[in-house]
């Protein structure tokens, strides 16, 4: 029944992945060792999208855990849900990629990749009707970015007709982890543009802001950030895991969200987000959810949609919600903010409903938007990239692993093309007549 195989690569990917599995195990009534002790049949009905049933009433995630060093894996294994995963599905090297994309993509990662693909193949064979893959990784490091994109392209070769969704943590403007982030991210985006079907962009700084401003946490830990990400991942995948009135799967989401194949980078948001103390002062209603969901402060990527326009967006409501109320609210948002939606896609807001809310909430909503303002994010990375690349700073780390400067130039120009494509569709209007759309080349971005 429409299974999804999940991969997590690198430190960031494994930590987000672990939080995700913790969240959905809870939603489906599984304990830390995968034994079902839930209360509702709805939890079991489509459990097999993400879990494989093993002997003895135990459910095992269809997850492949990959890293080039054993550290993070050991932490996952020792964590509260460490006994959930199948031991053979931990694939790790010993050397680490040292934040070097080339090591992850060409040298260290390439040595490990066949081992990973064996595990992926085995998981895929255990599926009835595989729907696709999802991968969690960061774009700033070596393993998640370099090896993650290598895996995506290899899986693409082997399963060309399956969906590929990525949850990618992009480097944030202020919070930087390593100095070569712009290189790693640009090289990764170059790959994702070609090989992924939908990429959900998440950004640490935006997550920090949500934790500080909305959740009122004084010093948020990575655990808090990962919790937010897992809430969104759980929301995006909720239609796949529970029966609902208006269900969608990865492919339906892509059909509704991706007007042009290269423009598949989404902003995500989640509501309700309230600080612990303020819970009792707010009623969670559909208007409230809709308003918070479209609030720029709620977006988990550091780009403000008010600087661009939505090509498409999708909202997934969970809980006991009336269909009519949701549709009215969504129409309301569109009418009030019509200038933020492109007018040449008439019905660009899609809604899905699922009757089962997340744990501890009456109702919630998850937002996925394809906005042209995501180009800010690519522009920012591109600028940092160019500044370093002009001076050829740190390049020897990459050329030493056998990379060519040409590859950097290609990645840079591909990203610039992406930015100008977004810009072109942001500026396009109905009235310009048909001749605009016949030319294939993206217009030059106006400086």
UniProtKB/Swiss-Prot annotation:
Biased composition (Acidic residues): 432-447
CDD domains per the UniProt record, alphabetical: beta_tubulin
Keywords for this protein: Cytoplasm, Cytoskeleton, GTP-binding, Magnesium, Metal-binding, Microtubule, Nucleotide-binding
InterPro entries referenced in this protein's UniProt entry, alphabetically: Beta-tubulin_BS (IPR013838), Beta_tubulin (IPR002453), Tub_FtsZ_C (IPR008280), Tubulin (IPR000217), Tubulin/FtsZ-like_C (IPR037103), Tubulin/FtsZ_2-layer-sand-dom (IPR018316), Tubulin/FtsZ_GTPase_sf (IPR036525), Tubulin_C (IPR023123)
Molecular function as annotated in GO: GTP binding; GTPase activity; metal ion binding; structural constituent of cytoskeleton
GO terms under biological process: microtubule-based process
Binding-site list for GTP: 11, 69, 138, 142-144, 204, 226
Signal peptide: none
Region of interest (Disordered), ranges: 421-447
Localization in the cell: Cytoplasm, Cytoskeleton
Cysteines joined through disulfide linkages: none
Protein family: Belongs to the tubulin family.
Subunit details: Dimer of alpha and beta chains. A typical microtubule is a hollow water-filled tube with an outer diameter of 25 nm and an inner diameter of 15 nM. Alpha-beta heterodimers associate head-to-tail to form protofilaments running lengthwise along the microtubule wall with the beta-tubulin subunit facing the microtubule plus end conferring a structural polarity. Microtubules usually have 13 protofilaments but different protofilament numbers can be found in some organisms and specialized cells.
Protein name as annotated: Tubulin beta chain
Lineage of the species this protein comes from: Eukaryota, Fungi, Dikarya, Ascomycota, Pezizomycotina
